[in-house]
């Protein structure tokens, strides 16, 4: 085979290889987008009850069952007034939420503290726009209210524990009055 023919064949093979790489990459992108959309469709978005959460997401149930409340956490919960309320923005797809939301639910299971849970999509939004209004950037975000006034936030994970951090926020808000 002459040098000219070899060069022509090599150019053809390089073009063919590049074309195959472009097609393979395009198929990979399409598959990734479809997989992401399928996963997102499985996630509840908006207001969600403890029962809905536990019915649809077994990781939350097992983390709830496995969590043992310390005596310090139990004491902190007991010291909170009933005027404390919580708004929890989280994702059923978020590993931090899978850890922290069950801990919160177990810590506050025997209190009159009101807990509103709002499940977010992968873009950290929900149809009513409450996440955007509350400037939610990370999940989970626990917004703590006393007498309907925001007194603090716990973002992704507490410093000590959820109940102890919430009690500290409450005490700080009282000291500032």
Model-identified regions with their sequence ranges:
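Structural micro-motif
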Residues: 134-144
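Conserved helix-turn-beta segment immediately C-terminal to the redox Cys motif
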Residues: 81-84, 103-118
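Bacterial N-terminal signal peptides
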Residues: 21-32
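Short active-site neighborhood of thiol/selenol oxidoreductases, capturing the structured segment around
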Residues: 82-92
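N-terminal leader/targeting and pre-domain segments
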Residues: 38-81
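Thiol-based oxidoreductase modules, predominantly thioredoxin-like and allied folds used
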Residues: 89, 113-126
